[in-house]
């Protein structure tokens, strides 16, 4: 991205990256919150499909606010996501992974080559340890909100770069 000369290509690449991040973090958050709300409400009694539709629209409304008009068929969006039944409560892991990678990338930008050996060790370890143990060599506390904020800060920087390029190109 840094070395590309065509600013319109840079704009397209930045848009794609930002959209991917939004889809992974915010969209998966909607799915997670919908599942939590549905199970919480189910604990109070049976739920009708209309009640599930309302929960779906409510959680999606939190993401989109007034920026997107959700047409009538969208209320059934929850019904085609099979993992709500077969593999419950795993969407949070997409959010966790995306923000972890963004925050680790920010660390790499700050530390440079000194970061690489620890990162390679992290990759080699795979799922052999708990997440908190995997990131301990980086001095990361997964319970510290400021660590997670660094991922969002990186997205903000990408967005600001996109704004500058778009303004310069008149798009």
Tell where the protein language model's regions lie, with residue ranges.
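Short beta-alpha connecting loops at secondary-structure transitions
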Residues: 13-20, 39
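C-terminal, non-catalytic "cap/extension" segments appended to globular domains
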Residues: 1-8, 24, 28, 32, ...
């Amino acid at each position: 991205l840094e070395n590309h000369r065509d600013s319109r290509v840079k704009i397209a690449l930045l848009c794609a990256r930002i959209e991917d991040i939004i889809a992974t973090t915010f969209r998966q958050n909607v799915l997670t919150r919908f599942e939590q709300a549905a199970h919480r409400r189910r604990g109070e009694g049976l739920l009708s499909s209309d009640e599930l539709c309302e929960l779906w629209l409510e959680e999606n409304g939190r993401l989109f606010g007034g920026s997107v008009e959700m047409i009538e068929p969208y209320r059934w969006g929850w019904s085609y996501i099979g993992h709500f039944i077969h593999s419950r409560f795993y969407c949070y892991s997409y959010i966790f992974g995306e923000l972890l990678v963004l925050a680790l990338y920010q660390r790499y930008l700050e530390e440079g080559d000194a970061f690489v050996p620890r990162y390679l060790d992290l990759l080699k370890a795979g799922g052999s340890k708990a997440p908190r143990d995997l990131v301990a060599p980086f001095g990361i506390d997964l319970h510290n909100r400021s660590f997670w904020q660094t991922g969002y800060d990186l997205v903000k920087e990408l967005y600001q770069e996109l704004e500058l390029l778009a303004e310069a190109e008149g798009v």
